[in-house]
């Protein structure tokens, strides 16, 4: 191929472009709706066919729901036990709706994760590892919230009861199964003891993997007197502007990862105050032990040692309750079977080696 024309386009136009012939190769979000549309275009109930050929790999990154420790805290002490409990109340309810939401949006093309790290990383904890826990699955007393025989509805109710325990630990007053005061002893608004807002860039139409999590959690929290406002943004720049201004309570987003799982950029807060130029402003974690572990881990070449250090880091991050890990999704690259000579496309595409790595070999029919 001598010339390649790269086009910036809207998500809705990616698949349609390949189907209609205006685009040869694209990378649509691989949602259940996208899969259905590809199968329909191929007319063979398969994502590979006469119209479209699909290649999938695990995404080098993951989706999450974040919280700012600077806005979501008690008595302006982001790292206190009370502040962590306050955030864990919300995180517990959010976490319990991950399974149903991700299954609804992605189907089998994504999985729920329990630590804030991509499953593509060698440092990602595995279910068989010692100390592995489902995210936000213990109550304020450190006891398991769920049992293996619980139904989904029973889990939702158990999460609410656990949230009440965390709100009490944060200093809120709870009466008859409802939160009746915030940690300061008053009310956030005339109608609610606690009112918070979650921002989600779902194109103004609920098109986001975490949208169902937030809306279901909002309905559930309402039952215990807590108001979670879900704001669906049509322009994602509003999300980043609000986060950077340190005015966001909660937000849905995703991290891109690198081959090396170094956590310095996102979680290091600086040994003598906030580190300039990093991404720690997203959560405002300020934890001396976490800082030391991050520096120790990045100073070593021993992968086994680093994995142990990073697991300790992840446990601290989860304890701060500023990030609810949500999903590990698959990436899809779709090719026009009619126009692209698939024999010339990279045969062994992986998370780390994409079709662009051998773009010089790609030919059109």
Residue positions per predicted region:
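Periplasmic-binding protein-like
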Residues: 76-136, 142, 146-168, 209, ...
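Pocket-flanking alpha-helical
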Residues: 12-17, 33-46, 237-272, 317-318
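Extracellular/periplasmic solute-recognition and catalytic clefts
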Residues: 5-73, 103-108
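Solvent-exposed, polar/charged alpha-helical surfaces in well-ordered, non-transmembrane soluble domains
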Residues: 2, 12-20, 36, 65, ...
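Sec-exported extracytoplasmic/periplasmic mature domains
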Residues: 19, 23, 40-43, 72, ...
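Short, solvent-exposed loop/beta-turn-alpha elements that line the ligand-binding surface or hinge
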Residues: 1, 40-57, 66-81, 120-161, ...
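Bilobed periplasmic-binding protein-like "clamshell/Venus-flytrap" ligand-binding domains
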Residues: 100-103, 170-203, 254, 300-337
């Amino acid at each position: 191929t001598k010339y390649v024309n790269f086009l910036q386009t809207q998500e809705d136009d990616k698949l349609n472009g390949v189907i209609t012939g205006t685009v040869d190769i694209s990378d649509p979000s691989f949602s259940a709706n996208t899969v259905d549309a590809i199968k329909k275009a191929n007319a063979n109930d398969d994502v590979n066919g006469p119209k479209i050929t699909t290649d999938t790999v695990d995404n080098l990154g993951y989706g999450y729901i974040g919280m700012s420790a600077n806005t979501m805290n008690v008595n302006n002490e982001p790292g206190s036990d009370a502040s962590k409990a306050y955030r864990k109340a919300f995180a517990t309810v959010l976490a319990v709706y991950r399974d149903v939401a991700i299954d609804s949006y992605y189907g089998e093309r994504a999985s729920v994760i329990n630590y804030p790290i991509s499953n593509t990383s060698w440092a990602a904890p595995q279910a068989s590892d010692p100390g592995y826990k489902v995210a936000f699955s213990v109550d304020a007393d450190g006891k398991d919230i769920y049992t293996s025989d619980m139904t989904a509805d029973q889990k939702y109710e158990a999460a609410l009861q656990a949230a009440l325990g965390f709100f009490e630990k944060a200093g809120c007053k709870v009466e008859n199964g409802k939160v009746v005061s915030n940690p300061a002893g008053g009310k956030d608004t005339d109608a609610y003891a606690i009112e918070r807002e979650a921002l989600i860039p779902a194109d103004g139409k609920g098109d986001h993997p975490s949208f169902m999590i937030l809306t279901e959690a909002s309905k559930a929290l309402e039952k215990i007197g807590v108001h979670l406002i879900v704001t669906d943004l049509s322009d994602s720049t509003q999300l980043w502007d609000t986060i950077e201004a340190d005015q966001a309570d909660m937000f849905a987003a995703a991290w891109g990862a690198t081959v090396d799982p170094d956590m310095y950029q996102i979680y290091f807060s600086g040994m003598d105050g906030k580190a300039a130029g990093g991404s720690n402003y997203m959560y405002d974690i300020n934890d001396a032990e976490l800082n030391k572990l991050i520096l120790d881990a990045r100073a070593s070449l021993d992968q086994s040692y680093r994995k142990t250090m990073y697991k300790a880091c992840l446990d601290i991050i989860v304890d701060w309750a500023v990030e609810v890990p949500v999903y590990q999704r698959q990436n899809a690259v779709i090719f026009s079977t009619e126009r692209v000579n698939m024999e010339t496309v990279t045969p062994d595409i992986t998370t780390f080696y994409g079709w662009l790595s051998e773009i010089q070999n790609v030919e059109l029919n």
